[in-house]
Each structure stands twice: as structure tokens, then as C-alpha cells.
Amino acid sequence: MFIINTLMLVAPILLAMAFLTLVERKILGYMQLRKGPNIVGPYGLLQPFADAIKLFTKEPLRPSTSSVSMFIIAPILALTLALTMWIPLPMPYPLINMNLGVLFMLAMSSLAVYSILWSGWASNSKYALIGALRAVAQTISYEVTLAIILLSILLMNGSFTLSTLITTQEKLWLIFPSWPLAMMWFISTLAETNRAPFDLTEGESELVSGFNVEYAAGPFAMFFMAEYINIIMMNAFTTVLFLGTCYNPYLPELYTINFTIKTLLLTMSFLWIRASYPRFRYDQLMHLLWKSFLPLTLALCMWHVSLPIMTSSIPPQT
């Protein structure tokens, strides 16, 4: 039964990821006053499947000087971790209802750094290695603010379980009392998923394509899939944390529909930002985090800790 449940979670995620690639190309096309993919199938709807067939039937070439095992393990690990992070998300029922669901997701996103680092190092290419080092520095840096913002939200939630956020936000979305945190969280998720304007890892003019420059066919597709699955997952996580949906036990479908619509709107904003903003310079990227976000999130976290102590003389319940 557990295998069936897992498949029922994985299959829609993969399908959503496939169509997100198409939607992105369409939206970018229309924003640049062109059509986007429109040949394969009606309105180009079968384009993702054509891409998948093409990529997975090609020969997976690898550089002769690369480290074979690590070169192959890296994309598999990236995709596995991207799918694993969906386990504790309540939609409205999680696959496994974990007591420490938030910590699990933080741990999984930290592990994803290894797949990037291994891919860059195993490629034995200077461009791939520079891209990987950039990606790792960026991901680790922005995880600091993500963790502090999560801690502030959990102080309001009173539990590490994601399902209790539904109860916490029955009357009021957490985005209203903590909108500065929500804004910083959204920008940090952009950086965490290596999306524009923070896609420093794949600066075409300098690094060709970033850490996956030596990859082709199936392994390349796996990195691509992991990236887009992470985008959807981060937006779903944002929905759970800040835009909690009212849950009716008699109509759980309403929760799922509401949750999906919010996640889709957030994902659209990711695509809109990509079409609108130029890429940051690397020092600007790091200054934004260490000199702006980190002091502000720490101050807000201390505020959320001190508020219950000041108002009702109780320590925050977690």
C-alpha cells in the first residue's frame, strides 16, 4: 500500500514538472512577443514528452577524465532528494506525518548541496567546478536565512509538525503578521533554487551552463527535473507556511484545490521574475544576504521570541 501511495505522490509531481517546463517556455515566449513551443501536439502541449523521449534515448556521454561513479551518482541523488522533500508536505495529508517535518526538509535541502558539488568535481572541468562552487556557496548562504525564518514561523506555530500550520492559520494567514519574513523567504527561495535573478551558477557568458556543463542525455535531464521539482516544492512549502488553507474534514478536496492554485500562482511569479529581472552580480548576491537579510531575520526572530515573554510572561511553545 505504501508503494502505491508513493507512486501516487511521485507521478503527479513528475507530470507537473514536465508541464512547468512548457509553461515557462510559453510565458517567456509571450513576454518576448513570440509564440514559444507550438509544433508538437496542439499548442505545443506534447513538447515535454518529446523532450523527455529525446533526452532519455540519447547516448549519455561523459568526459574521459571524469570520475565515473560520482559523475553518475550526482544527478540520481539530486532527483531523489528533490522527490524526497515532498514526503512531509500536508496536501492535506502528508505521505508520512513527521513530528519534525520542518527539520527533515531543511536536512534534505542541505544534502542537495552534495549532488551539485559532486557533479562539478566529478566532471573534471574548470567551468563545471566554478559553477558548482558558486552554487554551493549560494545555497549554503541562503539556507541560513531560510532556517531563521522557519524558526520564527515555528515559534508562532508552536510545533515542528507541518500539519499544525493548517490549524494555526485557520483565522489568519501568517503572511499578514510576518510579511517582512515572507518577502525575505520568497527571495531566499529564488536564490535557493538557483533561479533568475540569482542564477549565477549558469552565467552563460562566463560558465557556459554551470555545474552540469559536461552532462548530456539522461543525467542532464535528471538535473533539469530536480531543479523544476524543487521550484514547485519550494512554492508548495511557501503556501503551507504563509498562505495556510482552511481544512474541512468533510471536503478535503477543497483544501487540495486551494493549495494547488496558490502554489501555481507562486510558481508563475517565479517565471515572471525570470522574464523581468537581469542577473545579479556575485558580490551583490552575497551582500544582500549577509548584510541585509541575516541581521533583519535575526532581529525579527528575537522579536518573535521576546513577544510572548513580554505580553504573557510565557516562553515560546515549540
Curated annotation (Swiss-Prot):
Sorted UniProt keywords: Electron transport, Membrane, Mitochondrion, Mitochondrion inner membrane, NAD, Respiratory chain, Translocase, Transmembrane, Transmembrane helix, Transport, Ubiquinone
Catalytic activity, reaction form: a ubiquinone + NADH + 5 H(+)(in) = a ubiquinol + NAD(+) + 4 H(+)(out)
Domain of life assignment: Eukaryota
Molecular function in Gene Ontology: NADH dehydrogenase (ubiquinone) activity
Cellular component per GO, a single term: mitochondrial inner membrane
Localisation: Mitochondrion inner membrane
Ranges annotated as spanning the membrane: 2-22, 70-90, 100-120, 146-166, 172-192, 223-243, 253-273, 294-314
EC number: 7.1.1.2
InterPro entries cross-referenced by the UniProt entry: NADH_UbQ_OxRdtase_su1/FPO, NADH_UbQ_OxRdtase_su1_CS
Primary location: mitochondrion
Record's bilayer topology term: Multi-pass membrane protein
Subunit organization: Core subunit of respiratory chain NADH dehydrogenase (Complex I) which is composed of 45 different subunits.
Function of the protein: Core subunit of the mitochondrial membrane respiratory chain NADH dehydrogenase (Complex I) which catalyzes electron transfer from NADH through the respiratory chain, using ubiquinone as an electron acceptor. Essential for the catalytic activity and assembly of complex I.
PANTHER family, sorted: NADH DEHYDROGENASE SUBUNIT 1 (PTHR11432), NADH-UBIQUINONE OXIDOREDUCTASE CHAIN 1 (PTHR11432:SF3)
Protein name, as recorded: NADH-ubiquinone oxidoreductase chain 1
Organism encoding this protein: Hippopotamus amphibius
Gene name tied to this protein: MT-ND1
